[in-house]
Swiss-Prot record:
<keyword id="KW-0378">Hydrolase</keyword>
<comment type="function">
    <text>Catalyzes the stereospecific hydrolysis of the cyclic amide bond of D-hydantoin derivatives.</text>
</comment>
<feature type="binding site">
    <location>
        <position position="67"/>
    </location>
    <ligand>
        <name>Zn(2+) 1</name>
    </ligand>
</feature>
<dbReference type="InterPro" id="IPR006680">
    <property type="entry name" value="Amidohydro-rel"/>
</dbReference>
<feature type="binding site">
    <location>
        <position position="294"/>
    </location>
    <ligand>
        <name>substrate</name>
    </ligand>
</feature>
<feature type="binding site">
    <location>
        <position position="321"/>
    </location>
    <ligand>
        <name>Zn(2+) 1</name>
    </ligand>
</feature>
<comment type="similarity">
    <text>Belongs to the metallo-dependent hydrolases superfamily. Hydantoinase/dihydropyrimidinase family.</text>
</comment>
<feature type="binding site">
    <location>
        <position position="343"/>
    </location>
    <ligand>
        <name>substrate</name>
    </ligand>
</feature>
<dbReference type="InterPro" id="IPR050378">
    <property type="entry name" value="Metallo-dep_Hydrolases_sf"/>
</dbReference>
<feature type="binding site">
    <location>
        <position position="245"/>
    </location>
    <ligand>
        <name>Zn(2+) 2</name>
    </ligand>
</feature>
<dbReference type="InterPro" id="IPR011059">
    <property type="entry name" value="Metal-dep_hydrolase_composite"/>
</dbReference>
<dbReference type="InterPro" id="IPR011778">
    <property type="entry name" value="Hydantoinase/dihydroPyrase"/>
</dbReference>
<feature type="binding site" description="via carbamate group">
    <location>
        <position position="156"/>
    </location>
    <ligand>
        <name>Zn(2+) 2</name>
    </ligand>
</feature>
<feature type="binding site">
    <location>
        <position position="65"/>
    </location>
    <ligand>
        <name>Zn(2+) 1</name>
    </ligand>
</feature>
<feature type="binding site">
    <location>
        <position position="161"/>
    </location>
    <ligand>
        <name>substrate</name>
    </ligand>
</feature>
<keyword id="KW-0862">Zinc</keyword>
<feature type="binding site">
    <location>
        <position position="189"/>
    </location>
    <ligand>
        <name>Zn(2+) 2</name>
    </ligand>
</feature>
């Protein structure tokens, strides 16, 4: 039986257009759009009518970087796929791409199967997977080809975390060469982990144990050096490169230079680098531990380069790197030794709102908001135009957004499974009102109407900027 919904009277915003239009949804997909008040729009009929007058109608957010239930430092990220995808929906995100992990000594397939088992039947919204490659060998390289064919088309490597996820330059080059052949996209955590480990050891020997030292040892220059090295290795391999969680002015400069040379190099940043700084890491009484993530928060002056990069398209995507650990019992593992603080912050629920606040404050325009949060990540990870836009044939992943509502971000009211908010007390303008995932209401006028198991695994095509 056909199910139809009409969203009437809103300002439809995509990466390329803004138009006052009515949206007809049929069987989980966008069937048609027509300018509000025209005979074509008036002819839309449906059982369900959503009044979006005075509101924005935007594509559901695509968060290309989350870590649900991720093991790290002897504990696990606090959000499960159930709680994390529910929180994402509350924040206007309707698709996540999470990271399945290959453990050293194991196959990619084992890691991917484990993540499918965590997610299947538990997600409120649609999801896909990237693959973390921790152990490059001949078998792993063959498996990369198979995964691309199955719709896992991006592979993350780490220049950081020796002994855990770290790959050396030779392993990175081999994986990049394979990606150049099979169409995959290499995603890079670009920090010089070998040098950082020396600085960590030296800092602890001096008695520098507080959370703020996490930011001091993970130097911007070591992010820039690794970014430069990753770009040149990718150039040698003839492969595209996507650098995750870019935080430093010097790293943006490396990306800008590479793109000016015409290289297929892309960069992502995250809200924490745009809105927070080392001032947070330096908060007293171990409060700074809440803000320990890698790459680390930088001094405030780095924010201008990140905003500029987003405006000039030297940075193309804003994701969250959502990897929450509770302050109580998890972040506290690092009391007396900052290197033992689990690395990661909550944010999957806040991204769309914080980026709307960036529109309010004049950092970016409305269409750029949708571009960096919805359309570009969908294209980058082979999901467009099924995801990331509002157009006939697209999945009806749609958010009715109130641009005038005011809210105060707080752990008291958020839905992430973590005991603090990185943005506690921040007053912002704009709020999600209603969320549809494939036409099904997940949030209805600020009431949760979704269910675990609605979210479907979504295989991906290869990066659409390279075809």
């Amino acid at each position: 039986m056909s199910s139809r919904t009409v969203i009437r009277g809103g300002l439809v915003i995509t990466a390329s257009d803004e138009i006052h239009a009515d949206v007809l949804i049929e069987d989980g997909r966008v069937a048609a759009l027509a300018a509000t008040g025209t005979p074509a729009a008036e002819a839309f009929t449906a059982e369900n009518v959503i009044d979006a007058s005075g509101k924005y109608v935007i594509p559901g957010g695509v968060d290309g970087h989350t870590h649900m239930e991720m093991p790290f430092g002897g504990t696990y990220a606090a959000d499960t796929f159930e709680t994390g995808t529910r929180a994402a929906a509350w924040g206007g995100t309707t698709t996540i791409v999470d990271f399945a992990i290959q453990s050293v000594g194991h196959s990619l397939r084992e890691g991917l199967d484990a993540w499918h088992a965590k997610a299947e039947g538990n997600c409120a919204i649609d999801y896909g997977f990237h693959m973390i490659v921790s152990d490059v060998n001949q078998e792993t390289l063959k498996e990369m080809d198979l995964l691309v064919e199955e719709g896992v088309t991006s592979f993350k490597q780490f220049m950081a975390y020796p002994g855990v996820f770290y790959s050396d330059d030779g392993q990175i080059l081999r994986a990049m060469q394979r990606a150049a052949e099979n169409g995959g996209l290499i995603m890079m955590h670009a920090e010089n982990g070998i040098a950082i480990d020396v600085l960590v050891e030296q800092a602890l020997a001096r008695g520098e144990t507080d959370p703020r030292f996490h930011g001091e040892v993970r130097k911007a220059l070591l992010e820039a050096e690794a970014t430069h090295r990753a770009i040149r290795l990718a150039q040698v391999a003839g492969a595209p490169l996507y650098v995750v969680h870019v935080s430093a002015t010097e790293a943006v400069a490396e990306l800008t230079r590479a793109r000016d040379e015409g290289l297929p190099v892309f960069g992502e940043t995250c809200p924490q680098y745009l809105f927070l700084s080392t001032d947070n890491l330096a908060e007293p009484d171990f409060e700074g531990a809440k803000y320990v993530c890698s790459t680390p928060l930088r001094p405030k002056e780095h924010q201008a380069a990140l905003w500029r990069g987003l405006r000039t398209n030297d940075l193309q995507v804003v994701s969250t790197d959502h990897c929450p650990f509770c302050f109580s019992g998890q972040k506290e593992l690092g009391r007396g030794d900052f290197s033992r603080i689990p690395n990661g912050m909550p944010g999957v629920e806040n991204r769309m709102d914080l980026l709307h606040q960036a529109v309010v404050e004049g950092h970016i325009g409305r269409r750029r908001w949708i571009e960096i949060a919805c359309a570009t990540p969908a294209r980058m990870f082979g999901l467009y135009p099924k995801k990331g836009t509002i157009a006939p044939g697209a999945d009806a992943d749609i958010v009715v957004y109130d641009p005038h509502a005011e809210q105060v971000i707080s752990a008291e009211t958020h839905h992430m499974n973590v005991d603090y908010s990185a943005y506690e007390g921040r007053r912002i303008t704009g709020r999600v009102e209603t969320v549809l995932s494939r036409g099904e209401p997940v949030v209805t006028e600020r009431e949760y109407t979704g269910r675990k198991g609605h979210g479907a695994y979504t295989p991906r095509a290869t990066c659409q900027y390279l075809t």
